[in-house]
């Protein structure tokens, strides 16, 4: 039953992702994007990575998609304008097919512990590989979160030279925090600077640069007085 739910959620996420980019109505597209995040969150929870699954619901659905809806409503797009350019989607199908084939080839070539194309013989095999193989690969990394399954304590194996991690057991969220603020502290600071630039950059680019010279200010005051 658990494997069936994993396959169902993975298939739902893939189909919702396809509908996100094929829907002509931006509001409907955002709703399908919410469906993608819900399916992925459920998939992660069933795999045992409950904290990251709940974070998907809080961060992506609670903040990102709401921001998308706010921007779409603020732009006030007309459905007639969207339907007028809807026929142009079919012109890019050959290019989309080529890019999709290249991405599939890269996925099969780069992802480890994959023996060949012949394993893609069923939907269950594909999603089982994507769900278990990739997760085990990330768990084997030195900066990974190990076997951090929900509702179970895990041994801390990230910093083997620290004495306090040799005799302590950590929950999933404690394990992630241990890695994030010790081994990945530098990358956390770098990512925060990148997010700061991403926030300040659009504001700076969209600012209306006006002439603030004293002469211009005097002319503005004179126009207001008149």
UniProtKB/Swiss-Prot annotation:
Pfam families: Oxidored_q3. GO terms for cellular component: mitochondrial inner membrane. It catalyses: a ubiquinone + NADH + 5 H(+)(in) = a ubiquinol + NAD(+) + 4 H(+)(out). Its EC number is 7.1.1.2. Its main location: mitochondrion. Keywords: Electron transport, Membrane, Mitochondrion, Mitochondrion inner membrane, NAD, Respiratory chain, Translocase, Transmembrane, Transmembrane helix, Transport, Ubiquinone. It is a multi-pass membrane protein. Gene3D superfamilies: NADH-ubiquinone/plastoquinone oxidoreductase chain 6, subunit NuoJ. It is found in: Mitochondrion inner membrane. One of its GO terms (molecular function) is NADH dehydrogenase (ubiquinone) activity. The chain crosses the membrane at residues 1-21, 27-47, 52-72, 94-114, 126-146, 185-205. InterPro entries: NADH_UbQ/plastoQ_OxRdtase_su6, Nuo/plastoQ_OxRdtase_6_NuoJ. PANTHER family: NADH-UBIQUINONE OXIDOREDUCTASE CHAIN 6 (PTHR33269:SF17). Belongs to the complex I subunit 6 family. Core subunit of the mitochondrial membrane respiratory chain NADH dehydrogenase (Complex I) that is believed to belong to the minimal assembly required for catalysis. Complex I functions in the transfer of electrons from NADH to the respiratory chain. The immediate electron acceptor for the enzyme is believed to be ubiquinone. This is NADH-ubiquinone oxidoreductase chain 6. It comes from Mycosarcoma maydis (Corn smut fungus).
């Amino acid at each position: 039953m658990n494997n069936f739910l994993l396959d169902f959620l993975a298939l739902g996420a893939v189909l919702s992702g396809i509908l996100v980019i094929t829907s002509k109505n931006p509001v409907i597209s955002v709703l399908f994007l919410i469906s993608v995040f819900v399916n992925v969150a459920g998939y992660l929870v069933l795999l045992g990575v409950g904290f990251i699954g709940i974070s998907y619901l809080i961060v992506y659905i609670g903040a990102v998609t709401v921001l998308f809806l706010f921007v779409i409503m603020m732009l006030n797009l007309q459905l007639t304008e969207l339907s007028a350019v809807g026929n142009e989607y079919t012109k890019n199908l050959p290019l989309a097919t080529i890019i999709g084939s290249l991405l599939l080839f890269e996925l099969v070539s780069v992802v480890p512990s994959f023996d060949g194309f012949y394993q893609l013989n069923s939907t269950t095999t594909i999603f089982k590989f994507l769900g278990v193989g990739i997760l085990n690969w990330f768990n084997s990394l030195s900066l990974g979160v190990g076997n951090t399954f929900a509702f179970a304590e895990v041994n801390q194996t990230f910093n083997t030279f620290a004495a306090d991690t040799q005799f302590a057991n950590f929950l999933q969220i404690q394990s992630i925090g241990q890695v994030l603020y010790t081994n990945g502290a530098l990358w956390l600071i770098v990512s925060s600077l990148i997010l700061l630039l991403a926030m300040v950059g659009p504001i700076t680019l969209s600012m209306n640069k006006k002439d603030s010279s004293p002469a211009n200010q005097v002319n503005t005051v004179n126009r207001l007085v008149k």
